[in-house]
A protein has these predicted regions:
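Eukaryotic endomembrane system proteins
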Residues: 108, 115-116, 122-148, 157-161
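C-terminal flanking tails of non-heme Fe-dependent oxygenases
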Residues: 1-95, 100, 143-144, 148-347
Length: 347
């Protein structure tokens, strides 16, 4: 299968076809193969997540952003050496530029871990979340969403691997109970005062799969083969799925991670989105995938400014240190002053 001419619209993939007859599953695999190899993005329907589950999360999210500013700032990401909590507008960076959005970062609820001097510093990324006392329903809805979408993503990954002739359970052992999922609740509060328009700058995700729930405002753009960024019109009830850099590494570039960005909505219009990142254990090493098309893989897209590593935690910590300079300065300045302590920044 070769990369082909494209439509500006993303492919639509119905995951429920996996549970129908063998012919329907074969068609699903053909669609997944093409979408992951040619585009790196697609719209996912038939995923089984109900409207009630979605409403529970989005209602709690809107209630969170409607809290008094002081209540949100009490959960400031800068309080957390684990990079959990609330990030104010402009405090996160992509490629060094300010992102015009605020957000709440949530992960698996675990005890704080302080790595010993001989341990990898990425273990700082394990720890508790910060929750607003006034909204207990947010904790319930967010942790349910993480569990629910982890199941959807696992199923999708199985079908995706099968679609390229690989063993569908090839990566099961790097996920499991110590997987490192990540959820963001994001608000884009209209255009910035300086007219920059960067909701979030162009980037690729560094995990395995991202499942994005977006509202109907729009603003997500994907870079296609022509080098231009194309709008992704919202599709009610669908998740926008994109492949992360680890799948590109695992397949030596046969499956592609694609640049994408968000353009700030115009004027005072607000945009809300919920990206879920399906990530393996922090200490997982991503072995090359064995599959029939491996000989045709073009190789991984090289970016000297953003080296990729087979050990997942090194990639995530590298990204967090760059994206959250204030939290990094407070809790992890030693990793910048002594980069040899953090292999991801020096290898």
């Amino acid at each position: 299968m070769t990369r082909s001419s494209y439509s500006s619209q993303l492919p639509i993939v119905d995951l429920s076809a996996a549970d129908r007859d063998p012919q329907a599953r074969r068609l699903l695999h053909a669609q997944l193969h093409s979408a992951a190899h040619d585009v790196g993005f697609f719209q996912l329907i038939g995923h089984g997540v109900t409207e009630a589950e979605t409403r529970a999360l989005t209602s709690a999210m809107h209630a969170f952003f409607a809290l008094p500013e002081a209540d949100r700032i009490a959960l400031d990401n800068i309080n957390s050496p684990h990079f959990r909590g609330y990030t104010r507008i402009g405090d996160e960076r992509t490629a060094g530029a300010r992102d015009w959005r605020d957000q709440l970062d949530i992960g698996a609820e675990r005890a704080a871990r302080t790595p010993a001097p001989w341990e990898a510093p990425y273990w700082w990324l394990e720890g508790p979340n910060q929750w607003p006392e006034a909204l207990p329903e947010l904790r319930t809805a967010a942790l349910h969403w993480i569990e629910r979408l982890s199941g959807v993503a696992e199923r999708l990954l199985h079908e995706l691997l099968a679609s390229i002739g690989a063993p569908e359970d090839f990566y099961d052992d790097i996920f499991g109970p110590r997987a490192h999922p990540h959820l963001k609740l994001v608000r884009y509060p209209g255009s910035s005062g300086d007219g920059d328009g960067q909701g979030v700058g162009a980037h690729k995700d560094y995990g395995f799969l991202t499942l994005l729930l977006q509202d109907q405002v729009g603003g997500l753009q994907v870079q296609r083969e022509d080098g231009n960024f194309h709008d992704v019109p919202p599709l009610p009830g669908a998740f926008v799925v994109n492949l992360g850099e680890l799948l590109e590494v695992a397949t030596n570039g046969y499956l592609i991670a694609t640049n994408h960005r968000v353009v700030s909505p115009p004027g005072a219009t607000e945009r809300y989105s919920v990206p879920f990142f399906y990530n393996p254990r922090l200490d997982a090493r991503i072995n090359p995938l064995t599959f029939p098309y491996a000989e045709t893989a073009p190789g991984v897209t090289a970016d000297p400014a953003n080296p990729l590593f087979a050990e997942y935690g090194r990639n995530e910590l590298k990204g967090k240190l760059r994206a959250h300079p204030l939290t990094t300065a407070r809790h992890h300045a030693d990793l910048l002053l002594h980069p040899e302590a953090q292999p991801a920044l020096s290898s």
